[in-house]
Amino acid sequence: MSGGEVEIERKYDVDDEARMPSLIGVARVASADAPDAFDLDATYFDTPELTLANARVAVRRRLGGHDAGWHIKWPPLAEGRREQQFEPGEGEAIPDEVRAALAELVGDARLVPIARIRNHRIATVLRDSAGEPLIELADDHVVATDLREGPTSGTERRWQEWEVELLPGGSAGEASDRAALLDAVEERLVAAGAQPPSSGSKLARALGLSR
């Protein structure tokens, strides 16, 4: 288990016509690594009443990419959101340490699959002039399936989004420095067709929620 890291990121909706622009020369961005394409497959869990989602907590088991395993995303902070990671284990049985971390919220309540989110991601690391990683820029092509029992079961939603996440070089310094970097990147992305996200997270969108 990791003790948890704070992720600072912004997401944007884009349509099929949008093309990711070059960000070299924006703020401190001096170079870009070759894009890395991979597939992610995540199953999200909650109580049937969505106790975790209502508390703005997300629990998933994700395969693929560079951080496969169980993840808990905690409620947003003033800046960013803390995420804990656990080993993937075998199958979809929720590990004891994940249950223990959630005990205050759900006790021994039954946790069931509520959504599956598959994502073809094309990720590019942006670096400063010293080679330090500033940002991971992700072009996500998402297919989400609602797994809840009831009339929405099996509902499939597809969309594309761009995600900007600060890496160690971009996270250093003051909050104002981080905001300035993200704002500069956002200006370039908006000019290329990026729009504010229609939902607060991939899970919310998968479930047809706005938060």
Question: Language-model segments: what does each one mean?
Answer:
Residues 1-211:
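Phosphate-end processing signature that detects enzymes handling 5′-triphosphorylated RNA
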